Design a protein with these regions (language model features):
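Residues lining hydrophobic/aromatic ligand-binding pockets adjacent to catalytic sites
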Residues: 2-4, 8-135
Length: 135
């Protein structure tokens, strides 16, 4: 969402509109040009919106290399938001949440630190980091 109108409320220019992902194959045709390879989804998405959520980070801890790759495909004024990994907010990778391991367990804390280090690779393109709890 871009507010460029004269006299627009100054905070309006800080608003960003985006979706919870950019990697949906079904968007090829309706959103991405027909035949677009997955490797071009993010830069094409970023040409139309100013923010996106990387929901993939909930399912697996991203590497610093992967996050650097995202950064290189994004304009400077873009913000990428990401979910903390399931291992941090769900207490592990099991089907049921483990309340004794959520946020306050050595393994969860180690994954949280690795996640933050990886997301730091976004630099100024980093948006909010989200905690999606299973409750």
């Amino acid at each position: 969402l871009r507010a460029h109108a004269p006299g627009a409320h100054p905070r309006m220019t800080d608003w960003r509109l985006g979706t919870s992902s950019w990697s949906e194959p079904a968007w090829v045709g309706p959103f991405y040009p027909p035949g677009t390879p997955a490797g071009l989804f993010l830069p094409l998405y970023a040409a139309r919106y100013r923010a996106v959520e990387a929901d993939v980070t909930y399912y697996r801890l991203p590497s610093e290399r992967l996050v650097r790759g995202w950064r290189e495909k994004l304009p400077e004024d873009f913000r990428l938001c990401a979910k903390f990994p399931r291992s941090v907010v769900h207490g592990g990778s099991g089907a049921s949440p483990d309340p004794g391991r959520i946020l306050d367990h050595p393994e969860a804390l180690a994954d949280a630190q690795r996640f933050i280090a990886a997301m730091a690779e976004l630099g100024g393109r980093a948006g909010p980091l989200l905690l999606q709890f299973p409750y």
